[in-house]
């Protein structure tokens, strides 16, 4: 899933 920005977060993949 995409959260926040892209790789800006640990779960933003």
From Swiss-Prot:
It is found in: Secreted. GO terms for biological process: defense response to bacterium. It comes from the Eukaryota. Keywords: Amidation, Antibiotic, Antimicrobial, Secreted. Expressed by the venom gland. Its main location: secreted. The modification Phenylalanine amide is found at residue 11. One of its GO terms (cellular component) is extracellular region. Belongs to the non-disulfide-bridged peptide (NDBP) superfamily. Short antimicrobial peptide (group 4) family. May be an antibacterial peptide. This is Venom peptide 1. It comes from Tityus serrulatus. The lineage of its organism: Eukaryota, Metazoa, Ecdysozoa, Arthropoda, Chelicerata.
